[in-house]
Design a protein with these regions (language model features):
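Hydrophobic alpha-helical segments that drive targeting, anchoring, or assembly
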Residues: 41, 46-47
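Short, flexible N-terminal segments of the mature chain
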Residues: 12-41
């Protein structure tokens, strides 16, 4: 599985991230987000020019420590195990602290677009593409810069009228 990370900033160090204790329907995990290269990846689902972003290739150390979801059945099982309904909230939240105690990251690919239409799964609708989040730095064996950002590319191609 080929993973790419896009960032406006250069990455000098990978840090582990603690997961939010806030249990709201919109809460997503904290960590290094990576796009799974291929169908419904970040560039295809978010059309726009990525030349202003640094592009990194991420190599995982041990895929057995990452939770992978590749279909509806696995997504449903994940929600049953880690989902909860905050008091007074009709939508499902995920207990990211619990997920992080059992896994070093979560990757959902392919992106299951029809699940974004369920209002109870707001957290998944915000996932956006075939991607994942790595919150434990020990899950990553290498992060390699494969393309430098071009900060002012638009102005070079579209000079202002003088």
């Amino acid at each position: 599985m080929l993973l790419h990370h896009y960032s406006g900033n250069k990455i000098n160090e990978i840090l582990s991230k603690e997961q939010p204790t806030e249990q709201m329907h919109y809460t997503r995990p904290k960590g290094l987000w990576a796009s799974v290269v291929g169908d419904r990846d970040w560039p295809s689902m978010n059309p726009g020019d990525l030349r202003s972003q640094h592009q990194y290739e991420i190599t995982l150390k041990d895929e057995n420590k990452i939770r992978f979801i590749d279909g509806r059945k696995q997504l449903s099982e994940f929600i049953k195990k880690y989902g909860l309904k905050p008091r007074g909230e009709p939508r499902i939240a995920i207990d990211w602290v619990k997920v992080a105690t059992e896994h070093q990251g979560l990757i959902i690919a392919p992106y299951i677009a029809e699940h974004t239409r369920y209002p109870t799964l707001f957290w998944y609708g915000a996932w956006g593409c075939a991607s994942g989040c790595i919150w434990n730095k020990d899950a990553i064996s290498e992060i390699k810069l494969i393309r430098e950002a071009e900060p002012f590319w638009w102005f070079k191609e579209n000079p202002p009228f003088l």
